[in-house]
Amino acid sequence: AVKNMAEIAEFTERKIHYIQRFKTADFKIKNKLDAISHSTCSMAIDLDAKAIVVNSLSGRTARMVSRFRCPIDILGTTTSQKVWRKLNLSWGVKPVLCEEFSSLEVMLYNSLKEAKRMFNLQKGDNVVLTGGQINGKSGNTNLIKVEEI
């Protein structure tokens, strides 16, 4: 029964046109995180990005990006095993447990390296990164960056 349900779900998801759904949906942007998450998905679609990388202590940013059902692969990095387990349940998110990094640049570099490995990214592929400053506190998402491999 579970196998049949999985096959039906996979068949149905292949038939959904996620880009059209995203562009025609009327999302209510209520706060800064909504705006950043929506903009991340929008940029990824507009730039034909091959991946979205979300760095998140609490997992909230990754879940917010996931809720827009963006058709782009999402890599969710976190330092918490508890958050990593929860991100496994978020639509389209491939969670990765990582170490704490000393600077934003090091964190972005390592996240991008992991995305290259995980999604087999090639030279010329675009990746949209989002997250916040490294200060040990969650809830500080304030960054969107586009990188070309």
What are these regions (language model features)?
Residues 6-16, 44, 69, 91, ...:
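Structural signal for hydrophobic packing residues in well-ordered secondary-structure cores
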